[in-house]
Amino acid sequence: MATPMVEDTSSFEEDQLASMSTEDITRATRLLDNEIRILKEDAQRTNLECDSYKEKIKENQEKIKLNKQLPYLVGNIVEILEMNPEDDAEEDGANIDLDSQRKGKCVVLKTSTRQTIFLPVVGLVDPDSLKPGDLVGVNKDSYLILDTLPSEYDSRVKAMEVDEKPTEDYNDIGGLEKQIQELVEAIVLPMTHKERFEKLGVRPPKGVLLYGPPGTGKTLMARACAAQTNATFLKLAGPQLVQMFIGDGAKLVRDAFQLAKEKAPCIIFIDEIDAIGTKRFDSEVSGDREVQRTMLELLNQLDGFSSDERIKVIAATNRADILDPALMRSGRLDRKIEFPHPTEEARARILQIHSRKMNVHPDVNFEELARSTDDFNGAQLKAVCVEAGMLALRRDATEVNHEDFNEGIIQVQAKKKASLNYYA
């Protein structure tokens, strides 16, 4: 469609040129030459301006480089203000205050030398990207903000982040299929398939409490959960949060959740939560009150105004009976998963899991061994496999036979306390 129109235009121009006299064509040529000359002069002037601007930019970058020399003075943003000077304010030309005439954002900051400073000119950082509480690097002399610094966290909190993912798998856990399913539904699915919950209009649980006797696989389950998800994993221990100084434990909890927000999605695993989550009581001892303050900070982080649904909490304890009711209520640790002693079938599966890398004789009957290990937990069954291997090593055997496992059961049974009642 476009080709005939171009042909029509060119034929029209040819007809127009044919009808023009020689003088008209000469005049039109001169006009075009003048236009070309003017355009060339404009292009030359623009190139010169461009070169001068490049030179100025280079000079300014050199000045910025000189001003940005380390070390910086560290400061905190206290407040961000909007400056709107009145348009009708008239001042004498000799006494114009340029700072008062500026429009835009100004900053009040507090430096590490305990000085509070008002900055009408922010510096080299975009003012819209700043917010109160940000850590910034400022020039030692002019106090202009030169760079934003990463958030400050307690070094103990940074050490809680698990850098190397655990190698455990759900296949390493025997006899806890129901518990695995409940944990995956509450923690893993909301992170990997969030849209399924949104379709149903269901809010997933914020936290999970794993409880049961020692040695039943609570920590192992949390490690397997960390290995199966791509989320950041923070591991806290309850006794770690009990600190000597007042407010130190609460600050650790606050910093841990703040770090989790920055690295979201994130799973926070609190082992032995009964160290800080016991029922509240009247006490004259300041240490008890400090533990209660730490627990109150944990409650606030779980469902306070600043709670984040991308952060999931897994807590583990073997004393669920002494935990504070406020910690156990729905909306905080919504789902409670019990880890009982393994059944006979589960014991056989656990023995097979722990002996799968061992050179075991084909005649070993794991079902019979499971019947002989009544009231054994997962950790004790692992100890049985270790003892059986040590006995085979002692007699210079190349395979672990059924008698070695029986002897291992007897040895673990002898070391085990007569009563398995861990609660007073």
Curated annotation (Swiss-Prot):
Keywords: Acetylation, ATP-binding, Cytoplasm, Isopeptide bond, Nucleotide-binding, Nucleus, Phosphoprotein, Proteasome, Stress response, Ubl conjugation. ATP binds at G212, P213, P214, G215, T216, G217, K218, T219. Component of the 19S regulatory particle (RP/PA700) base subcomplex of the 26S proteasome. The 26S proteasome is composed of a core protease (CP), known as the 20S proteasome, capped at one or both ends by the 19S regulatory particle (RP/PA700). The RP/PA700 complex is composed of at least 17 different subunits in two subcomplexes, the base and the lid, which form the portions proximal and distal to the 20S proteolytic core, respectively. One of its GO terms (molecular function) is ATP hydrolysis activity. The modification O-acetylthreonine is found at T278. GO terms for cellular component: cytoplasm; cytosol; nucleus; proteasome complex. One of its GO terms (biological process) is proteasomal protein catabolic process. The 26S proteasome is involved in the ATP-dependent degradation of ubiquitinated proteins. The regulatory (or ATPase) complex confers ATP dependency and substrate specificity to the 26S complex. Interacts with transit peptides of proteins targeted to the chloroplast, and may be involved in the degradation of unimported plastid protein precursors. Plays a essential role in the gametophyte development. Involved in tolerance to zinc deficiency, possibly through alleviation of oxidative stresses or processing of poly-ubiquitinated proteins. Coiled coil: none annotated. There is a cross-link at K235, K279, K416 (Glycyl lysine isopeptide (Lys-Gly) (interchain with G-Cter in ubiquitin)). The modification N-acetylalanine is found at A2. InterPro entries: 26S_Proteasome_ATPase, AAA+_ATPase, AAA_lid_3, ATPase_AAA_core, ATPase_AAA_CS, NA-bd_OB-fold, P-loop_NTPase, Prot_ATP_ID_OB_2nd. Belongs to the AAA ATPase family. It comes from the Eukaryota. Ubiquitous. Residues 1-21 are annotated as: Disordered. The modification Phosphoserine is found at S19. Disruption phenotype: Displays a severe male gametophyte development defects in cv. Wassilewskija but not in cv. Columbia due to the complementation by RPT5B. This is 26S proteasome regulatory subunit 6A homolog A. It is found in: Cytoplasm; Nucleus. It comes from Arabidopsis thaliana (Mouse-ear cress).
